[in-house]
Amino acid sequence: MPIGTPSVPYRLPGSQYERWVDIYTRLGVERILFLGQEVNDGIANSLVAQMLYLDSDDNSKPIYLYINSPGGSVTAGLAIYDTIKYVKSDVVTICVGLAASMGAFLLAAGTKGKRVALPHSRIMIHQPLGGTSQRQASDIEIEAKEILRIKDMLNMSMADMTGQSFEKIEKDTDRDYFLSAEEAKNYGLIDRVITHPSEANQS
Protein backbone atom coordinates (compact mmCIF):
# COMPACT_ATOMS: atom_id res chain seq x y z
CA MET A 1 0.00 0.00 0.00
CA PRO A 2 1.50 3.37 -1.01
CA ILE A 3 2.62 5.63 1.80
CA GLY A 4 1.29 9.17 1.49
CA THR A 5 3.18 12.30 2.48
CA PRO A 6 3.26 12.38 6.30
CA SER A 7 1.73 15.31 8.15
CA VAL A 8 3.11 16.79 11.36
CA PRO A 9 1.74 19.37 13.82
CA TYR A 10 3.03 22.92 13.49
CA ARG A 11 2.28 26.01 15.56
CA LEU A 12 2.58 29.31 13.69
CA PRO A 13 4.66 31.94 15.53
CA GLY A 14 2.41 33.90 17.89
CA SER A 15 -0.43 31.39 17.64
CA GLN A 16 -1.68 29.16 20.43
CA TYR A 17 -3.12 26.65 17.99
CA GLU A 18 -1.41 23.89 16.09
CA ARG A 19 -2.22 22.94 12.54
CA TRP A 20 -1.25 19.89 10.54
CA VAL A 21 1.09 20.48 7.60
CA ASP A 22 2.93 18.07 5.32
CA ILE A 23 6.39 17.20 6.54
CA TYR A 24 8.18 18.90 3.63
CA THR A 25 6.47 22.21 4.42
CA ARG A 26 7.52 21.84 8.05
CA LEU A 27 11.11 21.06 7.08
CA GLY A 28 11.10 24.09 4.78
CA VAL A 29 10.40 26.31 7.78
CA GLU A 30 13.70 25.03 9.20
CA ARG A 31 15.43 25.79 5.86
CA ILE A 32 15.62 22.09 5.03
CA LEU A 33 14.81 21.11 1.44
CA PHE A 34 14.61 17.61 0.03
CA LEU A 35 15.34 16.32 -3.47
CA GLY A 36 14.00 12.80 -3.17
CA GLN A 37 12.93 11.93 -6.69
CA GLU A 38 13.91 12.17 -10.33
CA VAL A 39 14.86 15.70 -11.33
CA ASN A 40 12.20 17.24 -13.57
CA ASP A 41 10.83 20.70 -14.31
CA GLY A 42 8.22 20.50 -11.54
CA ILE A 43 10.64 19.62 -8.74
CA ALA A 44 13.19 22.11 -10.12
CA ASN A 45 10.67 24.96 -10.08
CA SER A 46 9.66 24.05 -6.53
CA LEU A 47 13.24 23.93 -5.22
CA VAL A 48 14.22 27.13 -7.05
CA ALA A 49 11.22 28.96 -5.55
CA GLN A 50 11.99 27.69 -2.05
CA MET A 51 15.66 28.63 -2.25
CA LEU A 52 14.84 32.12 -3.53
CA TYR A 53 12.33 32.63 -0.71
CA LEU A 54 14.67 31.37 2.02
CA ASP A 55 17.51 33.49 0.65
CA SER A 56 15.36 36.64 0.62
CA ASP A 57 14.04 35.86 4.11
CA ASP A 58 17.51 35.57 5.70
CA ASN A 59 20.63 35.01 3.63
CA SER A 60 22.85 34.83 6.72
CA LYS A 61 21.57 31.33 7.47
CA PRO A 62 22.41 28.25 5.40
CA ILE A 63 19.95 26.29 3.29
CA TYR A 64 20.15 22.50 3.71
CA LEU A 65 19.49 20.44 0.58
CA TYR A 66 19.16 16.69 1.20
CA ILE A 67 19.63 14.62 -1.96
CA ASN A 68 18.40 11.08 -2.62
CA SER A 69 17.90 11.14 -6.37
CA PRO A 70 18.68 9.01 -9.44
CA GLY A 71 19.17 12.17 -11.51
CA GLY A 72 16.98 13.25 -14.39
CA SER A 73 16.56 16.22 -16.70
CA VAL A 74 19.76 18.14 -17.40
CA THR A 75 17.96 21.44 -18.05
CA ALA A 76 15.89 21.12 -14.87
CA GLY A 77 19.00 20.20 -12.90
CA LEU A 78 20.91 23.17 -14.27
CA ALA A 79 18.10 25.47 -13.10
CA ILE A 80 18.69 24.17 -9.55
CA TYR A 81 22.47 24.38 -10.00
CA ASP A 82 22.34 28.00 -11.18
CA THR A 83 20.11 28.93 -8.24
CA ILE A 84 22.49 27.30 -5.75
CA LYS A 85 25.24 29.50 -7.17
CA TYR A 86 22.95 32.55 -7.39
CA VAL A 87 21.68 32.79 -3.82
CA LYS A 88 23.79 34.48 -1.14
CA SER A 89 22.96 31.83 1.47
CA ASP A 90 25.39 28.96 1.87
CA VAL A 91 23.82 25.80 0.47
CA VAL A 92 24.74 22.69 2.44
CA THR A 93 24.26 19.61 0.24
CA ILE A 94 23.77 16.27 1.99
CA CYS A 95 23.62 12.90 0.23
CA VAL A 96 21.37 10.30 1.83
CA GLY A 97 20.98 7.05 -0.08
CA LEU A 98 21.89 7.79 -3.69
CA ALA A 99 23.01 10.85 -5.61
CA ALA A 100 23.35 9.75 -9.23
CA SER A 101 23.85 11.61 -12.49
CA MET A 102 22.35 15.10 -12.05
CA GLY A 103 21.85 14.27 -8.36
CA ALA A 104 25.63 13.89 -8.00
CA PHE A 105 26.20 17.11 -9.95
CA LEU A 106 23.94 19.02 -7.55
CA LEU A 107 25.60 17.39 -4.54
CA ALA A 108 28.98 18.69 -5.73
CA ALA A 109 27.46 22.14 -6.41
CA GLY A 110 26.95 22.96 -2.74
CA THR A 111 29.04 25.53 -0.91
CA LYS A 112 32.67 24.40 -0.78
CA GLY A 113 33.41 22.87 2.59
CA LYS A 114 29.71 22.11 3.16
CA ARG A 115 29.11 19.21 0.77
CA VAL A 116 28.61 16.06 2.81
CA ALA A 117 27.29 12.51 2.67
CA LEU A 118 26.10 9.93 5.17
CA PRO A 119 28.36 6.87 5.52
CA HIS A 120 26.41 4.40 3.38
CA SER A 121 25.51 6.81 0.60
CA ARG A 122 26.35 6.00 -3.01
CA ILE A 123 27.30 8.54 -5.64
CA MET A 124 27.32 7.91 -9.40
CA ILE A 125 28.55 10.15 -12.19
CA HIS A 126 28.22 9.62 -15.94
CA GLN A 127 27.83 11.53 -19.17
CA PRO A 128 24.43 13.04 -20.06
CA LEU A 129 22.02 10.68 -21.75
CA GLY A 130 20.45 11.47 -25.09
CA GLY A 131 18.43 9.66 -27.68
CA THR A 132 16.77 10.20 -31.01
CA SER A 133 13.59 9.04 -32.56
CA GLN A 134 12.72 8.75 -36.25
CA ARG A 135 13.56 12.28 -37.32
CA GLN A 136 15.33 14.04 -40.15
CA ALA A 137 19.09 13.53 -40.31
CA SER A 138 19.68 17.28 -39.91
CA ASP A 139 17.66 17.32 -36.67
CA ILE A 140 19.57 14.31 -35.34
CA GLU A 141 22.85 16.08 -36.12
CA ILE A 142 21.72 19.23 -34.28
CA GLU A 143 20.67 17.19 -31.26
CA ALA A 144 23.97 15.29 -31.21
CA LYS A 145 25.96 18.54 -31.28
CA GLU A 146 23.88 19.92 -28.41
CA ILE A 147 24.43 16.77 -26.32
CA LEU A 148 28.20 17.06 -26.86
CA ARG A 149 28.10 20.75 -25.92
CA ILE A 150 26.22 19.98 -22.70
CA LYS A 151 28.59 17.10 -21.94
CA ASP A 152 31.63 19.39 -22.20
CA MET A 153 29.94 22.07 -20.08
CA LEU A 154 29.01 19.59 -17.34
CA ASN A 155 32.50 18.07 -17.36
CA MET A 156 34.12 21.51 -17.05
CA SER A 157 31.84 22.39 -14.14
CA MET A 158 32.50 19.03 -12.48
CA ALA A 159 36.25 19.52 -12.88
CA ASP A 160 35.97 22.93 -11.23
CA MET A 161 33.86 21.60 -8.35
CA THR A 162 36.03 18.55 -7.65
CA GLY A 163 39.53 19.75 -8.49
CA GLN A 164 39.95 16.85 -10.91
CA SER A 165 41.26 17.46 -14.43
CA PHE A 166 38.81 17.81 -17.31
CA GLU A 167 40.42 14.77 -18.94
CA LYS A 168 39.89 12.59 -15.85
CA ILE A 169 36.26 13.68 -15.52
CA GLU A 170 35.72 12.96 -19.21
CA LYS A 171 37.27 9.49 -18.88
CA ASP A 172 35.49 8.57 -15.63
CA THR A 173 32.05 9.69 -16.87
CA ASP A 174 32.31 7.76 -20.13
CA ARG A 175 30.42 4.98 -18.32
CA ASP A 176 28.54 4.81 -15.00
CA TYR A 177 31.12 5.52 -12.28
CA PHE A 178 30.02 4.57 -8.75
CA LEU A 179 31.70 5.81 -5.58
CA SER A 180 31.19 5.19 -1.88
CA ALA A 181 30.87 8.18 0.42
CA GLU A 182 34.56 7.95 1.35
CA GLU A 183 35.58 7.59 -2.30
CA ALA A 184 33.43 10.60 -3.20
CA LYS A 185 35.29 12.61 -0.55
CA ASN A 186 38.66 11.60 -1.98
CA TYR A 187 37.42 12.44 -5.48
CA GLY A 188 36.33 15.94 -4.43
CA LEU A 189 32.59 15.49 -4.96
CA ILE A 190 32.00 16.06 -1.24
CA ASP A 191 34.04 17.50 1.60
CA ARG A 192 33.17 15.18 4.49
CA VAL A 193 31.39 12.01 5.49
CA ILE A 194 29.19 12.77 8.50
CA THR A 195 27.33 10.79 11.15
CA HIS A 196 25.59 13.60 13.05
CA PRO A 197 23.50 16.63 11.94
CA SER A 198 25.79 19.05 13.80
CA GLU A 199 28.62 18.12 11.41
CA ALA A 200 26.74 19.21 8.28
CA ASN A 201 27.37 22.96 8.51
CA GLN A 202 31.00 22.78 9.63
CA SER A 203 33.51 24.26 7.18
From Swiss-Prot:
GO terms for molecular function: ATP-dependent peptidase activity; ATPase binding; serine-type endopeptidase activity. PROSITE patterns: CLP_PROTEASE_HIS, CLP_PROTEASE_SER. It is found in: Cytoplasm. Disulfide bonds: none annotated. Its EC number is 3.4.21.92. InterPro entries: ClpP, ClpP/crotonase-like_dom_sf, ClpP/TepA, ClpP_His_AS, ClpP_Ser_AS. GO terms for biological process: protein quality control for misfolded or incompletely synthesized proteins. One of its GO terms (cellular component) is cytoplasm. Keywords: Cytoplasm, Hydrolase, Protease, Serine protease. The keyword Hydrolase applies. The keyword Cytoplasm applies. NCBIfam families: PRK00277.1, PRK12553.1. Fourteen ClpP subunits assemble into 2 heptameric rings which stack back to back to give a disk-like structure with a central cavity, resembling the structure of eukaryotic proteasomes. This is ATP-dependent Clp protease proteolytic subunit 2. It comes from Prochlorococcus marinus (strain MIT 9312). The lineage of its organism: Bacteria, Bacillati, Cyanobacteriota, Cyanophyceae, Synechococcales.
